[in-house]
């Protein structure tokens, strides 16, 4: 088979056995070692793939068609690349093949357009030898011990290794600690006899997808790329340059991995700062939101971050733990980062304390009180509940005997969340009506979706605890709105 193959691995997936005629076992692989003499000339592997990329003839494969992988697939499909998407979830595959979507910011119309331009979805992982390049962007969660869980990355690399052929480009996109590409992915890919930088090419380029962001999307967000060696870097830069507005090459995969960890840790520690100031300023009778709005009028030296009920999403609450873990492996302590994590983790307890105080002021205990949580997605106007602080808030309120329910126009049913003690709630979003609002003892604003009419909610709810400053400017009797 001439030329190289490109495989992009991205998204939210759950790996068991890969489906298809030749399934990959979870713990064992059968990889054929190819003698060097049987390989194509190594000198012929690099240039043909560069040419195919520039002519947009290279086929792009994406494993994991979730919040990262599907927008990435669209970015390449829109530029004329044939895209083959992989996912172990056959339901997702069937829906995509029908031109349907399951992600809010990638509409069915967009998916139909992708299909018309040659996009194909499959759950048959033995087809991994068909694309011309490989990008890995599978989830990288934490274990119960809050340590890096690279299961999805490792299983993806094993799946690729079984089908890997000379000339393919593999790019890891999953957020992870510096060293993962070289120390974890490379040895797995080389287990069949092919050598990175000679027989196939390897790079790291961190995903920067921001679901729900109408200003920035996959094609417009600059792409940082670090190659294992110069030819791998050249190929990865050439590939992303075809679909992205800007590509930023760095010296190594480790530099690119460290870049993403820096970005997310920077955000986490600054949110921790304003969360701590929120607690302090509240004690002093100062509105932290007013202070931030005033401070951001300074045209230099200040960037606004906002407090909230806790961190959410698949990156910000998790990635700093990857950095602290690898720091400990090097005999160092990241005290500042770990302290920020403690502050952010404490926010749900702080909010529940404010709810309890507000109810006590009305002569009611938390136990037995009806509390409606508004918004269970981790941020505004997305349908992603991963790591949402709403789950911890719900846990804490249930433990104190509250009667809890929720409304979220984007989350019709709560998914099972393994971290939580009451994770099998099987709770569905309640309709937001005048009668339901009036029947609650407290309405807790967790996520400020734009679909909510705050004046209407304030009018009919007896008590509101607002963690997002969503009710700013809304007239209400004194004490009806409590900021937390």
Which residues are covered by each model-predicted region?
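Structural/interface elements that position substrates and couple domains in central-metabolism enzymes
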Residues: 28-484
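Short, Lys/Arg-enriched N-terminal segments with co-localized hydrophobic residues
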Residues: 7-28
């Amino acid at each position: 088979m001439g030329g190289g193959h490109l495989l992009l691995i991205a998204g939210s997936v759950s790996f068991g056995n890969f489906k298809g005629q030749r399934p990959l076992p979870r713990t064992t692989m059968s990889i054929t070692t190819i003698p060097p003499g049987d390989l194509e000339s190594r000198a012929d592997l690099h240039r043909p793939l560069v040419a195919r990329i520039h002519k947009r003839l290279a086929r792009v494969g994406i494993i994991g068609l979730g919040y990262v992988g599907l927008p990435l697939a669209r970015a390449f499909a829109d530029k004329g690349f044939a895209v083959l998407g992989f996912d172990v979830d056959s339901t997702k595959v069937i829906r995509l093949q029908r031109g349907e979507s399951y992600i809010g910011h990638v509409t069915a119309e967009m998916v139909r357009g992708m299909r018309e331009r040659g996009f194909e979805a499959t759950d048959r992982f033995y087809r991994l030898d068909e694309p011309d390049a490989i990008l890995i962007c599978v989830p990288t969660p934490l274990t119960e011990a809050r340590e890096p869980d690279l299961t999805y990355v490792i299983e993806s690399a094993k799946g690729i290794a079984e089908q890997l052929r000379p000339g393919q480009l593999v790019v890891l996109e999953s957020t992870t600690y510096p060293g993962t590409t070289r120390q974890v992915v490379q040895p797995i890919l080389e287990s069949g006899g092919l050598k990175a930088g000679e027989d196939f090419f390897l790079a790291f380029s961190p995903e920067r997808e921001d679901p729900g962001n109408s200003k920035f999307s996959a094609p417009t967000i600059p792409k940082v790329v670090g190659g294992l060696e110069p030819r791998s870097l050249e190929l990865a830069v050439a590939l992303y340059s075809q679909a992205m507005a800007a590509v930023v090459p760095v010296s190594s995969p480790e530099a690119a991995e460290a870049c993403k960890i820096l970005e997310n840790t920077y955000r986490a520690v600054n949110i921790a700062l304003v969360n701590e100031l929120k607690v302090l300023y509240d004690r002093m009778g100062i509105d932290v939101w007013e202070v931030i709005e005033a401070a951001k009028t300074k045209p230099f030296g200040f960037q606004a971050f906002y407090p909230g009920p806790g961190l959410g999403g698949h990156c910000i609450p998790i990635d700093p733990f990857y950095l602290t873990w690898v720091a400990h492996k090097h005999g160092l302590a990241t005290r500042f980062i770990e302290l920020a994590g403690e502050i952010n983790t404490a926010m749900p307890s702080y909010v529940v304390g404010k709810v309890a105080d507000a109810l006590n002021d009305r002569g009611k205990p938390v136990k037995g009180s009806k509390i409606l949580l508004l918004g269970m997605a981790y941020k505004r106007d997305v349908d992603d509940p991963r790591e949402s602080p709403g789950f911890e808030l719900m846990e804490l309120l249930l433990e104190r005997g509250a009667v809890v329910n929720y409304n979220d126009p984007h989350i019709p049913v709560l998914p099972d969340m393994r971290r939580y003690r009451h994770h099998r709630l099987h709770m569905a979003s309640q309709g937001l009506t005048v009668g339901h609002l009036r029947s609650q003892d407290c309405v807790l604003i967790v996520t400020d979706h734009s679909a909510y009419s705050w004046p209407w909610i304030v009018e009919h709810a007896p008590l509101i605890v607002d963690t997002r400053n969503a009710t700013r400017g809304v007239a209400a009797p004194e004490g009806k709105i409590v900021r937390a």
